[in-house]
Regions:
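Glycine- and acidic-residue-biased ligand/ion/polar-headgroup-sensing regions
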Residues: 67-70, 77-92
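Conserved short histidine dyad/triad with adjacent acidic residue
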Residues: 45-51, 57-76, 96, 106-110
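Short intrinsically disordered coil segments
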Residues: 79-81, 138-147
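Non-catalytic surface loops within mature trypsin-like serine protease
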Residues: 52, 67-68, 88, 128-130
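A short, N-terminal "cap"/entry segment at the start of jelly-roll beta-barrel domains
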Residues: 1-56, 141, 151-160
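Ligand-binding loop in jelly-roll beta-barrel domains
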Residues: 96-99, 107-137
Length: 160
């Protein structure tokens, strides 16, 4: 389930926020949300906040596509989170996860590496709040998580 970039149909986060403020709800799709492709790994991702994007306490949801055999170094996050395998498979800290599997993680507890299966993997990640940026741990140099590129596109809590 590879995500396709549909730049012509994308909606800005400001537009989504304006509609949400005016109507109290908004309907969108992953194809309308801004997307980032990580050059280092080929990972494609989109994100939104549950509620207004400037609310640091709001849950933050990411949809990620990991290309076949993609590897991401061990890391952690400053908030609790949950991951759901939508398609494909992914090895996390030595354990294979498959479509429908759910992994729940606590803040500041490291995991990884992540290795996508031969068919790739589509993952839905729900962070408890805006403190989602990955923090590299161990021997990795941070290049496979490239938090700065994600932060350039997606909002995070101010203290992240």
């Amino acid at each position: 389930m590879e995500m396709k970039n549909t730049t012509n149909d994308s909606r800005s986060i400001k537009e989504i926020n304006d509609t949400l403020k005016k109507r109290g709800h908004v309907v969108t799709s992953w194809n309308e949300l801004p997307q980032v492709t990580m050059d280092e790994t080929g990972i494609e991702t989109s994100s939104y906040r549950v509620g207004l994007s400037d609310n640091d306490d709001a849950p933050t949801v990411f949809k990620l596509y990991f290309p076949p055999n993609c590897r991401v170094e061990a890391h952690t996050h400053s908030c609790d989170y949950s991951e759901i395998i939508i398609e494909g498979s992914q090895k996390v800290s030595g354990k294979w996860l498959y479509k429908g599997d759910i992994r729940v993680g606590l803040a500041n507890k490291g995991y990884g590496p992540l290795i996508a299966g031969p068919e790739g993997a589509s993952i839905l990640v729900i962070f408890a709040d805006g403190n989602w940026p990955a923090i590299g741990i161990g021997a990795g140099d941070g290049s496979t998580i490239n938090a700065s590129k994600l932060l350039a596109q997606f909002s995070a809590a101010e203290n992240s």
